[in-house]
Amino acid sequence: MVLLHVLFEHAVGYALLALKEVEEIILLLPQVEECVLNLGKFHNIVRLVAFCPFSSSQVALENANAVSEGVVHEDLRLLLETHLPPKKKKVLLGVGDPKIGAAIQEELGYNCQTGGVIAEILRGVRLHFHNLVKGLTDLSACKAQLGLGHSYSRAKVKFNVNRVDNMIIQSISLLDQLDKDINTFSMRVREWYGYHFPELVKIINDNATYCRLAQFIGNRKELNEEKLEKLEELTMDAAKAKAILDASRSSMGMDISAIDLINIESFSSRVVSLSEYRQSLHTYLRSKMSQVAPSLSALIGEAVGARLIAHAGSLTNLAKYPASTVQILGAEKALFRALKTRGNTPKYGLIFHSTFIGRAAAKNKGRISRYLANKCSIASRIDCFSEVPTSVFGEKLREQVEERLSFYETGEIPRKNLDVMKEAMVQAEEAAAEITRKLEKQEKKRLKKEKKRLAAIALASSENSSAPEECEETSERPKKKKKQKPQEVLQENGMEDPSVSFSKPKKKKSFSKEELVSSDLEETAGTGSLPKRKKSFPKEEPVTDPDESENKRVPKKKRKLSPKEEPLSSGPEEAAASKSSGSKKKKKLRKLSQES
């Protein structure tokens, strides 16, 4: 009995499933389709044999790339060798991708099957996968798929920004569309303005110039000799300007109203702006082609080379095409019609717009188109795979086409391809060295500018950080000066702090008994002179700062005394009065001691 297993690749890992009742399942495909939607019925058909989760997102990306390329990864090999039966002939493995199935069958020897009932079973596994694997939720499975999808796409879409060919494809498509639109709009302006000035159509053939003249002239009756110089600037021909002026005087056109003239002028200005944008777009296309495909543009021209790239889809696809495909690229309808009717196949497609085929004789058009397609294929491959693209090879290939064209006409033998390519290699090396030298110079200049910019930023940041510190210092300094100013002013005037001066008289008036006893004891111990009483006053004052105490002591010699203190500093009469007051105090103390 053949055992049918199914391999399912998911973003979180590989899953190997086994099917029950293989013969019935293969025969009854409609019943399988019904069971896929129901989880209970699907469990009766399929069971999970093994699940190999990926250890990291990088491992998942490696396995996804291997599966897409048809390569058997080591993780997949280990899973199949471990969990599939050893008898390989009795095992049938169902896979979704035929490429990976062929690789498994070639390397491991298991018979693989795709399509049919396998596709339906894989559809059911994909639908119920989060229910088959324990611990896996639908949300986590979706997140894993999203992350792997982004990583896989990012790896596939990597490209060089400076050599992107998508801009060329869009530019040439827009350029062709603009040519059609400008032609259509110009014909509309000619018909519209031709009712008023029909002779101008015969004089001016260029569409853009005609629209500029219609915008400038307006009403033909207002055209005079003063506008002749401006007409010469627009037409760039004095004879045509004179013919326009003469035709306006004897024109057969009908009169036109102001509102119609305004509409014609506005529409003409739009056509003129479109033609100017078309010129700027053509310049942009030329510069882009010189960056992306310089050899191809030097060989066949920017417009034809861009059309070849756009028709192929990319420069890489064009480089993969053989010369026979490049020759008929753009003539697919004629080719299939010829194959269908068994007629002659076309000789050229888009390369017909090249100047070489137009210059060749009728009998040599097929030859030169085949030779030109060969050189275009070589040039596209050089542009696609060279590290430093240059136009040297394209110029040499163009010279070869010119020599071959002259050979068809005159019989002059052209140079050998080997000699031409040797010269091209020497010139290409020199050009590549020059380009690298310029790039190095530009890189050095950029680094210097970056260093200067970083130094300027660092200097500005240091200045900004030092500015607040200076502001703090300047804000602190005036505060200190304000505190010291009153003391300095009082000291200069010979006065103390008013709080100190007012506190002293109060202390003299209110003495307690203990203070009086201490003062009498000091007088009895000493000489009882006046200076000893004065020494007791500073002891009662609290001194916090030694500098302030010194400042307070020094001005006592100079300060002006109040009227209450004047008797203390007067002559011998005051000294006698003070002695009498001291004797009275002694008597009071004696009485108090006797009473106690």
Swiss-Prot record:
Residues recorded as bearing Phosphoserine in the entry: S314, S465, S466, S510, S518, S519, S536, S562, S569, S570, S581, S583
Domain Nop residues, every copy: 292-410
Cross-link (Glycyl lysine isopeptide (Lys-Gly) (interchain with G-Cter in SUMO2)): K87, K230, K240, K539, K564
Record keywords: Acetylation, Cytoplasm, Isopeptide bond, Methylation, Nucleus, Phosphoprotein, Ribonucleoprotein, Ribosome biogenesis, Ubl conjugation
Membrane-spanning intervals of the chain: none
Compositionally biased intervals (Low complexity): 569-581
SMART domains hit by this protein: NOSIC
GO molecular function, one term: snoRNA binding
Keyword Cell division: no
Listed InterPro entries: Nop56/Nop58, NOP58/56_N, Nop_C, Nop_dom, Nop_dom_sf, NOSIC
Region named Disordered: 458-596
Summary of subunit composition and partner proteins: Part of a large pre-ribosomal ribonucleoprotein (RNP) complex, that consists of at least 62 ribosomal proteins, 45 nonribosomal proteins and both pre-rRNA and mature rRNA species. Within this complex directly interacts with TCOF1 in an RNA-independent manner. Core component of box C/D small nucleolar ribonucleoprotein (snoRNP) particles; the core proteins SNU13, NOP56, NOP58 and FBL or FBLL1 assemble stepwise onto the snoRNA. Interacts with NOP1 and NOP58. Interacts with NUFIP1, RUVBL1 and RUVBL2; RUVBL1:RUVBL2 seem to bridge the association of NOP56 with NUFIP1.
Protein name (database record): Nucleolar protein 56
